[in-house]
Amino acid sequence: MNYTPFMSVFDVDPPIIDNKHLIKWLKINFSFLRNKLLKIKQLDSERDINFIIFINNKKKYVLKISNPLEKINILKYQDRLINYLRSDLSLKSFIPKIHHTNIVKYLDKKNRECFVRILSYIEGRMYGDTKSNDKIENSLGKLLGKVSTKLKAFNDIDAHRNFIWDPSNIKWIKKDINIFTGSKKLILLKCFSEYEKFVKNNLNKLRYSITHSDPNNYNIVIKENNVCGLLDYGDSIYSPTINDLAICLSYALMNNDNIYLTLKNIITEYNKQFSINEDEINSLISLCKSRLMITVVMAKKQRIKYPSNQYLSISEKDAWSLLEKLDKIPINFLIYIVREICGFDIIHHHNEIINYINKFNFGNIFKFNLLDKNKSILKLSSDSPLLKGNPDNSSLKKRVNKIFKEDNSRIGIGLYNEKRKVYKGPNFISELNTNERRNIHLGIDIFIDQGTDLFAPIDGKIIILKNNNFKYDYGPTLVLEHSFKKYKFYTLYGHLSKIMFQKLKIGKKIKKGEWIGKIGNSNENGKWLPHLHFQIILDLLGHDKNFPGVGEEFLFNIWNKISPDPNLILRIPKSFYSNNNNFKDTLKKRRKNISDNLSISYKKPLHMLEAKDQYFFDRYGRRYLDCVNNISHVGHSNSYVHEAMTKQNLKLNTNTRYLYDTINDYSELLLSKFPKKLNKIFFVCTGSEANDLAYRIAQTYTSAKDVFVMDNAYHGHTNALIDLSPYKFNSKGGLGKKDYVHVLDMPDPLRGKWRYQNSNWIQKYID
């Protein structure tokens, strides 16, 4: 529907009434009011005029006198709508009852025809005059959801009309934005642009029905912390069903310190009654802002026309305050909040991007691989002893260097999802709950020497290159855009050196491994100890100069989807972050409880925390190539092996004494890899058992005893195998070589008795 300007009820004065004359007229025209003591009190209204009727100073009714231009068919439609809603027992008590039999004409003081209706009065306080709470907001969402559900099955030809307050049809408002100037005009232009993107282009995808169209805070009645009434059906039209929720929110969020909680309360309960789909979610916030636009535009125009009617501007100040607050919150972030509330994936393509990142072979961001260096965890949380004051405190460097010395490292890691107390400025106060701050770290900090070169871990394009030169901000900042298929994600590099501005420019394409900057010093990086703030971003939320490095704790589930853990790219083992073990305590317990015969390798023992594929990872997050353990045949933490073992153990785990298929299947598969002569299998549990059994078979088959072994060999821990192992019998505590054991030199061309410089070195070993 397109709105076309025409002479409407908004263009003429509302009825002008003589109260005494009206009371006499009421007694004549309504039988239930005859012979009664009547008093009337005018209510606030916009285009018509309404009164409370008091009968004998007790019983109350609502008297509605229409605008002279109001058409009777619209009023009859309203009555049909009210009766339809009251036919639902769960809604009946919330909807005013009609007390007029017919709609009667009344002439105002200007002799203009107006129509009169009488409805029941619902006792309570207006939502706009009530301090809201969870219970009120929940009941409001529930009632609106029920109304939307009920109205799905109702239609009326008179509801199909253009209406100036319809937030889904505000093309008319564009020209009126010019009556504003400065920041207000910019806010309205931005809102209109969002309307075109999120509403106008989405209208064909929205569900339509008859809507109340004005569930504002003075059409909602509250009693005992519950909504008890929904008033005024004069704005009801056929429009996108989601309009009612959007309009309700545009008023419920006014003068509200906790926008998030109100959104959550109302939308959650509405969604339980009337399930919101993804297209409606995409339009909801913009529809809410569009209604606020209508409010401020109409208020200014009406105030000029009727300067004495303060009711016409009743919501203007609050609407502007909310528009200014919402303007600071990216609309996509608000959409993500609604998606989470309604149970949808926060970012619909999140999993595709994360799967791509998990599989991609990223390059190093420094000249070296972080996994090949000792690293120290630098906790900057609220209870951390590191931060005794401001982050630029000179003693911080001393405390960090002390940790580096203890860990024999020169690299510090500041944690993702860490709650920090250093973000104290007013710009860190949450717009969604002013009682909370943005204090959860959304990146990983890598503390390293200033001047250290940085390199792109993946191909990209520079889209942000900005010096955010504010205290405790990023300082020189770089953001790269990365594309695959139809998706994009971004990496942010903060606290860099200004030198990058001389060598890089916006739009420059960067190849994996290409230089992208240096670590900045504290005079240029926002007054921080030299480090890199590294962050992954799936949606820039409209930012083109900067991006938040910290988010609200109560919104972390959303921030986590927008800025997932940067360790997806860095790939420092998880055990490094969760390592709470004290090396000295671990070593002490080992020596106390485990025999010294089970020796520990290396003078300074390696404290291993994790293993994956061919690598071990120690407590410093440093990796080691495992060439010792037999597990390297299939790799550590092999998910396929783990899954197969788990599946089998949940079904059956027994020995060779019983008949079952698994052992046969495995035997056939294993034998298929061997020569045909090897056609029988012995199953044992360890290498010692296998070697001992093979030795006994050989003895039995040959009736011989003599054995050739290599020097320094170890074959197992059974008595028979220790006698065959020079590593054991020739070592301290060993019993020496048996006469049937013959030790051969290990043919080592580099360190052996005969070396490759001797052309006959191989023959020497044979001889």
Question: What is each PLM-predicted segment?
Answer:
Residues A456-M500:
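Zn2+-dependent peptidoglycan hydrolase active-site motif and core
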Residues E668-I766:
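PLP-dependent aspartate aminotransferase-fold enzymes
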Residues I65-R112, D134-N138:
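A conserved alpha-helical element in kinase catalytic cores
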